[in-house]
Swiss-Prot record:
Keywords: ATP-binding, Cytoplasm, Kinase, Nucleotide-binding, Pyrimidine biosynthesis, Transferase. Its EC number is 2.7.4.22. Inhibited by UTP. UMP binds at residues 58, 78, 139-146. This is Uridylate kinase. Catalyzes the reversible phosphorylation of UMP to UDP. It comes from Legionella pneumophila (strain Corby). It is an enzyme of class 2 (transferase). The gene is pyrH. InterPro entries: AceGlu_kinase-like_sf (IPR036393), Asp/Glu/Uridylate_kinase (IPR001048), Uridylate_kinase (IPR011817), Uridylate_kinase_bac (IPR015963). Pathway: Pyrimidine metabolism; CTP biosynthesis via de novo pathway; UDP from UMP (UMPK route): step 1/1.
Amino acid sequence: MNESQPKLKYKRILLKFSGEALMGKSQFGIDPSVLDSLARDIAELIHMGVEVGLVLGGGNLFRGKALSQAGVGRVTGDHMGMLATVMNALALRDALERIDLPARIMSAIPMLGVVDPYHRRKAITHLRNGQVVIFAAGTGNPFFTTDTAACLRAIEIGADIVLKATKVDGVYSADPLKNSDAKRYDYLTYKEVLTKGLEVMDSTAICLCQDQGMPLQVFDMAAPKALKRIVTGERVGTIVGANHDQ
């Protein structure tokens, strides 16, 4: 790393980006400008020496809840959602490669000829070689969210932290768009998230991070230079860890 570069607090991160965020201001699909902006932010991290893994949701292309109400089975719906995350991963890989940033997609569901199958040791090698690794198809199993997949992959690859990009600047006691008295938290413990019922991630993801001591940081992706500020140690959004001194 160049001496002029700021000192890094986090050398390897797992970024969780929701499918809905990829829509931008649209109601469905992928906004190319959002992809390009995300790709530029990731490129900045790579040039700083940060190793970046990503997990994308699929809610911009597929909404399992609506199909479930129409009678489609949960397992079928979850498998369809996994395929949606692969489509988002392909779009992001293309955006990264357009700016000459090497990227690999590793899918929990084998799709030879389209993406690579997930392999932990190969993923770590790619990260060490400066490639962005996009983990697709969730965990490969129904009944598990992409949030849980993000935490699982972060633990497997030895990431320093899970960064969850959202549309608000952290975790609140209530929906800040509906309740002006909602309180924003700077720090939370895993236990506080679970006992307060805060919508940070689903309980399976939180418990997994708690068991393995994996910290989380929830932040507003639209905040200027958010990712760069986080990896250099600035407090952006809400940090979730074992204690308030995380």
